[in-house]
Amino acid sequence: MLFRSDLKPLLKRKDIALVSLDYKVEDKIDGVYYPECAENTENYDDLAALIAELDMVIGVPTTAQHCAAALGVKTWCLVPKYHQWRYAQPVMRWYNSMWLVHQTQLDDQVYKDGKLTFTRRDRSWKEVIEYVEKKL
């Protein structure tokens, strides 16, 4: 599971501005723009208009990722190690503008009292974020 806090290294970059396309964000990070249109999950017109104005979209597989790629916006999709079949290749077969960045290690997962919890979660996504940062 990728956490917003995992993206903090990208905040150090002065040449990029981060815009959250998530909805119902509770743990907001300073330095990230949270547009109101991302909160409206019943009408994606405003969100699609915002996405069309972005230079690039980076994030885990979501509706926003697919919308960005369908609009032709350069999109890097951060794919978990265990993923659905459509994310198996380095590129998405339906969109020329989507490139898939695969996680190569798993988070350390522990079942405790019947609930899945994560320990040392930063170990696996750290390498993905470092790779993305180098490629930007």
Sequence positions of predicted segments:
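Short, small-residue-biased leader/transition segments that mark boundaries at the very start
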Residues: M1-L2
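Short catalytic helix/loop segments, enriched in acidic residues and glycine
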Residues: S5
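Donor-binding and catalytic core of enzymes assembling or modifying cell-surface/extracellular glycoconjugates
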Residues: K8-W76, P80
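Nucleotide-sugar donor-binding patch of glycosyltransferase catalytic domains
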Residues: I29-G31, E36-C37, H66-K135
